Amino acid sequence: MRDRLLAAEKVRAIEWRDSTLYLLDQRALPFEESWIAYDSAAGVAEAIRSMVVCGAPAIGISAAYGLVLAACGRSVAGGDWFAALEEDFTLLVDAAPAAVNLSWALNRMRERLERVREHADPLAALEAEALAIHESDREANLTMAQLGVDLIRRHQGNPQALLTHSNTGALATGGFGTALGVIRAAWLEGMVERVYADETRPWLQGSRLTAWELASEGIPVTVNVDAAAAHIMKTKGVTWVVVGADRITANGDVANQIGTYQLAVNAMHHGVRFMVVAPSSSIDMSLASGDDIPLAERAGEELLEIAGKRLGEGVEGFNPLFDVTPADLIDAIVTEKGVVERPDTAKMAQLMCRKRLH
């Protein structure tokens, strides 16, 4: 499976070359493939804020490279550049304060920095750590893809319809994707008849990004309006909903792109299994449940303009980025450490004690 996935790889969204970070601008897709070069932490932070790069793992990887860029700039300026990097840590964290992968990646970089203060070449050591974070995510994607396929096969090995939400593919990670990585692997194993991709309003990550990724690999994909998901589950033979996660709490609650919660409710009603695929870096054991997750919102004004005209006075917009799916609606959480079925606090704690499977 690993070799087949590697051979099928067509999309990469993050590249590090000659001490420069290159990001595929997701805002321009699918109409234009445009790469933007970054040489500062401030630029990377803005890329995260403005959604040039999306997806929890991809944000964390980009932030790690952003810190390398900051270190390079600080070292040239001279003085105690180690201490000065604290400003860059804060700048990058503030770009997406709710993204646990970002804080995880930066904390790992901070720990590495503490160990290399007396290193002959601390900048090279920091760069190596960022590259390791990137490669580790890629390897985790491969492991999760295999585990997810095994889970699907255990219930049904025949070609079947799957439904997904937002974008969880190569654009959102350092490799093949989390949920979309599982779907890719299932396609290679002959277990996918068609993928239904929620358009995922208001940023349309499903129709702009997921459909583009799947179509580029010849995987049959149908884009549907978000509100049609329940109807599709009822009439199109969907067997699994496969989604990613921005944050998972100690009890197995999952924060993800807005609309995920209603998918889980509808899946349970229709007897459709619900799988969450995310690296263990998305798990925040410091939060007891989803009630503790700060859920970001974008400006409600974004919803109040149609064809360049604002809706009538007295109308307000509610524009949440995320919602929380309770653990009791989830059939399985797939990570690179293993699979947790019917997650709860005890099972999540046991999972986090395991070593990575790759």
UniProtKB/Swiss-Prot annotation:
Family matches, as InterPro entries: IF-2B-related (IPR000649), IF-M1Pi (IPR005251), IF_2B-like_C (IPR042529), Initiation_fac_2B_a/b/d (IPR011559), M1Pi_N (IPR027363), NagB/RpiA_transferase-like (IPR037171)
Key words of the record: Amino-acid biosynthesis, Isomerase, Methionine biosynthesis
GO molecular function, a single term: S-methyl-5-thioribose-1-phosphate isomerase activity
Highest rank taxon of the organism: Bacteria
Stored Pfam families: IF-2B
Keyword Amino-acid biosynthesis listed: yes
GO BP terms: L-methionine salvage from methylthioadenosine
Site for Transition state stabilizer, residues: 166
Functional pathway: Amino-acid biosynthesis; L-methionine biosynthesis via salvage pathway; L-methionine from S-methyl-5-thio-alpha-D-ribose 1-phosphate: step 1/6
Reaction(s) catalysed (UniProt annotation): 5-(methylsulfanyl)-alpha-D-ribose 1-phosphate = 5-(methylsulfanyl)-D-ribulose 1-phosphate
Annotated EC: 5.3.1.23
UniProt binding sites for substrate: 54-56, 205, 256-257
Xref: SUPFAM superfamilies: NagB/RpiA/CoA transferase-like
Active site feature: 246 (proton donor)
Entry's family note: Belongs to the eIF-2B alpha/beta/delta subunits family. MtnA subfamily.
Purpose of the protein: Catalyzes the interconversion of methylthioribose-1-phosphate (MTR-1-P) into methylthioribulose-1-phosphate (MTRu-1-P).
Protein name: Methylthioribose-1-phosphate isomerase
Species: Pseudomonas fluorescens (strain ATCC BAA-477 / NRRL B-23932 / Pf-5)
